[in-house]
Amino acid sequence: MKDDLPTKDTNKTMNSLLPKRSDKQKKYLRFGAMIGTSMVLMYLVMYANTYQLSHVQWSETRFFMTLLMGATMAVVMLAFMLGMYKNPTANIAIAMGSVALFALGTFLVRSQTTVGDESWMSGMIPHHSIAILTSENAEIEDVRVCNLAKNIIEAQKREIDEMQWLIDDINQNGPAATSVKANSRPVPEYAGEAMRSCD
């Protein structure tokens, strides 16, 4: 019976192994946290070129692109740090998960299958805002190009106002699914104004 009991040496060996396994698990948990945090920050950074703060709205398309970037980053970082991450099973799982996430993100961003009326417009508003920012601030010398930029600014501002009105109207009254309903709730006319001068 005494022979069956664990010896002090056995206990020491087992205890010495536990921290090592724990450290390995912590490394992979930190890796996942690093990728997740980076994805959140990348999504937020994509709004850095928004013309004004009110144009920052949820965009499913940008979220899908964040999935693509996160999946790509996970594979690249793992490849460069294989010396730190030595669990083949975990590494294969990360690689396969990243491929699956990349495929899902590609399908969603190209098919737009989950994007409806309101989510489409809320994604288009920050997209239009980029055009306003670049068209207002670009160092343009050619008068023809300047006039084109002004037209773009005015059109994008007008369309942003229209989309914001439509989002509010749909939230309050539901979609106008027929021409009769649409005609009874016409979109107001907005006039976009450019700050840029081409004189």
Give names to the regions the model predicted.
Residues 2-199:
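His/Met- and acidic-residue-enriched segments that coordinate or traffic transition-metal cofactors
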